Amino acid sequence: MVVSVGFVMGIIRSIGFAAGLGLLVCSAPAVDVRRGPWGELELLPVMLSPMNEVLPDGTATVYATEWYFPGHTTSSLVAFLSGVSLSAAQQASLLDPEVWSRDAAGVIGVRPAETVVLSLSPESRARLYAELAGSPANQRYYQPWSIRTNVMNALLAGSELTPEIQAQIRRVAYLRGDRYLVSDFPVLLNATTDAGQKIRLLRLRNASSGYDVQLRVPSGGSIDALVAYWGVMGREGRIRPYLDAMCRTTGDMQMDITHLLPVFARTRLNTFPKMVVGDAMVRDCHWSSLNFFNTVPDDTFARLTGMQQEIRHNYVKIDGEPGFGDLMFFTGTDGHIIHSAVYLAANLVFTKNGHEATHPWVI
């Protein structure tokens, strides 16, 4: 699942159509059933957190927060900050010339006091951070940590963070759609001197949300439609025997859709990349998306030129509803492509957020 300040820019389809395990830190009751040409899917929200050895060593780091406002003049920024429902004390602090700066390009930067960051109201935080999210220079706001609202309580309950820190997380979280976003982990890390709590915060910050997805296979029913949907790209012969065996049992059966994915996705789903010293390959969302149907990953997709060539020669844009294996692009408000993913079914995608070893492959 992709969450960003953007929207789906386009869907393209391959013209072939005619890792160490992460730690599952929490789950929530299955609340979502989705039916369609893919069959009947049951979704269980889960969170994956990397093991401590792949986390950045941030226990002794003092983090700085600076907001950048490209496109703003002094007067327009003053007007904006005066219009986001700040308290008099917050407004005075953020408008203090001592916390303002300009870079060589004239972009205004503001260094907010951490007390101001922690005290923002949900309304002010959402409006202010939506503005910051318009620029990649504000990376934590442009691509914030996010979690579905129905998973937040379970995640914090299993986090082993103190009640005080849990309350701070709730205070700095802001809503966008059905997700909570958090951009202020650096402020939270600075607020505690407990090394153990810092490590737990780092694990939480690097946790990724996803779904465990089960397909209900009706007993004695026809599997032709399921084979047609999940068996694209010449995979019907692999999919049919498995589904056929499931439907011959007594009573409806459920199967993890991992078994229906190509080998690349099947062997990586809900795992973290292996760390290899000296390996500079950028195996990110684009590399993962373009290798979805490959048995042996093609590292030319880790380079922009290789990715562009593959899309230009082997994909076509489609305007209708996406189907299994279609490639989806997500853009920022400036039109810049910030993410890609592979459509599976029921508005679910297979993806990897970033190339880092702390980011798993998820649905």
Predicted features along the sequence, with ranges:
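Detector for intrinsically disordered, low-structure N-terminal pre-sequences
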Residues: M1-F7, L24
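N-terminal capping segments
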Residues: V31-F301
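Bacterial N-terminal signal peptides that target proteins for export
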Residues: V5-G16
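Sec/Tat signal peptide C-region and signal peptidase I cleavage site
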Residues: C26-A30
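...with weaker cross-activation on analogous glycine-rich loops/strands in unrelated enzymes
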Residues: D299-T358
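Bacterial N-terminal signal peptides
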Residues: I15-V25
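Aromatic- and glycine-rich peptidoglycan recognition patches
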Residues: D32-V54, Y315-V316, L344-I363
